[in-house]
Amino acid sequence: MSSLYTLPGHLIRRLQQIAVALFAARMAEAGLDLTPVQYAALSTIHDNPGVDQATLAGLIAYDRVTLGGVVERLEQKGLVRREVSARDRRAREIRLTEAGDDLLTAALPWVEKVQADIVEALGAEERAVFLSLLSKLTDAGNDRSRAPLRDDRTDPARS
């Protein structure tokens, strides 16, 4: 039987724990109240103004129900607003508020520091290989996820 400490799944889970801890520490250092999924949502809404919740969930690979709670908390904090779509009265579009845009701008340099923290033990060449392999594995396993990423990179119809 393989040692737990050599199993890819265990190591990936540990790295995720470390990444979340680093994110929380950097946000606390910056005095910002933001989680990794909230940052992903704000960043994606910024890049896709008027996105609907189902599309947003696909763009950040999160299940719709959980993301609904995330969007609700962002709305309660005054960081996003949901509006009835002019194209489809049944749909609700999500947009950043000025406060959401300001928070995203303030968080960006700290998020960049977190990313550097995560891979600081690797040299430049190792980082490139590591990120390439992570992308390869996540792309290859995307359809097996309970919340697959849905964007231009993973949509075969757009390739």
Regions found by a protein language model. Name each.
Residues 1-33, 44, 152, 158-159:
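N-terminal leader segment of winged-helix/HTH proteins
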Residues 9, 13, 17, 61, ...:
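Short amphipathic alpha-helical segments with heptad-repeat character
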Residues 10, 40, 55, 65, ...:
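Active-site phosphate/pyrophosphate-handling residues
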Residues 14, 18, 46-47, 62, ...:
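Alpha-helical structural segments
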Residues 21-66, 147-151:
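N-terminal helix-turn-helix DNA-binding core of bacterial DNA-binding proteins
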Residues 50, 72-139, 158:
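Charged, amphipathic alpha-helical coiled-coil/dimerization segments
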Residues 58, 69, 132:
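DNA-binding alpha-helical recognition surfaces that contact promoter or target DNA
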Residues 127, 140-159:
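Short amphipathic alpha-helical interaction elements located at domain edges
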